[in-house]
Amino acid sequence: DAISSIPLARLRTEDKAKTFAGVNIANVLIYVGFNLFYLGYCLPLVESGGGNWLTDTFYDPGTGVGYVFIANLIASVVKFLLLAPTMLRGLTKPQLALLKPMLLYSIPLLFAGLAGMMNEMFDRVMLKRLLYPILGESNAMFQLGVYGACYKLSIVITLMIQAFRYAAEPFFFSQAKEEGSKELYAKIMTYFVWVLAGTFLFVMLYIDLFKYFIPNEEYWVGLKVVPILLMANIFLGIYYNQSVWYKLTEKTSFGAGLAIFGALITLVLNMVFIPKYGYMASAWATLICYASMMVLSYFLGRKYYPVPYELGKIGAMIGVAALLYWATLVLNISQMQFGFAINLIFLFAYAVFSWFLLQPLKK
C-alpha cells in the first residue's frame, strides 16, 4: 500500500481520475469479494457441516478472522500490479539531491498524520479505559458500541472530504503560481462548505432513515451525537481545505503543530469529561478539537498565505443549515404524519437561500 501510494499520487497530478478511481474501486471490490467468499460463504458452510471442493481447497477453519487480513493482502497485491505500469513509466535513477528537501517537507506531515489518527481514534480508547472502573465492563462496552455505531453516520461527510481532497490538492498545487489563484481557492471553499452544510441538513432531516444503518436498535439512543459529529467533520473539512497555505509555502511543520495541538485538546477534554458525561463528552471534544484547529489554521494562514475566504457566506450557510435543523426539532416534525415530505420544504429553503447567496460568485 505504501509503495502504491506513489503511482496513485502521480495519477492525481496527471488528472487521470478514471484510472485512479478504477484502481481504487477494484481494490475495494476485491477486498469485499474475498471477505464475502471466506466469511460469508465458506465459514457458514463449514460450520453447518457442509463443504465442497472450494472449501476443501481454499478454506482452513483454523485461520478464522485471519481471512480478513488475507483478503486485504490479496487486494493490495492486485492494486500494486495494476499500478505497476504507472510506476515503471519514466523510471529514472534515484536523484539523491531531492531526498533532503523531500524529507524536510514530508516528515512533519508524517507527524501530522499520526496526530490526526490519534484525534480520530483516541476518544474510543479513552471511553473504554475511563468508563470501565466506573460503570463496569458491560456498560462501558455498551457506551463504546453506541458511540462507535453513531459515529459511522458522520462518515458521510468524511467520505465527501476525502473525495474532495483527492481532486483538490493536485489542483491547488497546479494553480499556485497562476494569477487569481487565491481568489479561486476562496471560491472553492465557499462551494465546498455549501455542499457539506447541505449534507449535514439532509442527514439530520432524515435521520429516522439513516438510523437503520445501525442494525442494533439499542444503539439508537446515541443518535443525539450525530449532529455534533457531523458539524465537527464540517470543521475538519474546512481545516483540510485551509491546509493549502502551509503546503504551498512549505511550512509543513505548522501542519504537525496544528495536529498535535488538536490531539492535546482531544486528550485533555476526554480525560476530564468522559467519567461524568460518557460518550457525549467524546462527541463535544471532537467538535471543539476540530473547531480550534480550523480557527488557529485560519489565523496562521492569514499571516503566511492570506486567502480571501468569504467568511460571511461560509458562516451563513452553516448557520442556516443548523437553524433549519433546529426548527424541525422545535416543531417536532419527525412526529408529524407527513414529516418526511415537510422536510423537503426545509431542504428547498436551504437550496433557495444558498442560490441567492452564491449568485455573485457566478458573475
Roles of regions detected by a PLM:
Residues 20, 24, 68-72, 101, ...:
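Residue-level signature of transmembrane alpha-helical cores of multipass secondary-active transporters
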Residues 53, 57-65, 116, 262-265, ...:
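Transmembrane alpha-helical segments of multi-pass transport proteins
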Residues 61-65, 101-105, 109, 127-155, ...:
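Interfacial/gating helices of multi-pass transporter permease domains
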Residues 146-260:
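Specific pore-lining/lateral-gate transmembrane helices of multi-pass inner-membrane transport
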Residues 19, 96-108, 285-347:
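Membrane-interface "helix-start" segments
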Residues 45-71, 78-120, 167, 171-183, ...:
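Interhelical loop/hinge segments that connect adjacent transmembrane helices in multipass membrane
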Residues 1-24, 87, 230-261, 303:
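Membrane-interface junctions at transmembrane-helix termini in multi-pass inner-membrane proteins
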Residues 21-88, 261-266, 279-300, 342-350:
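Hydrophobic alpha-helical transmembrane segments
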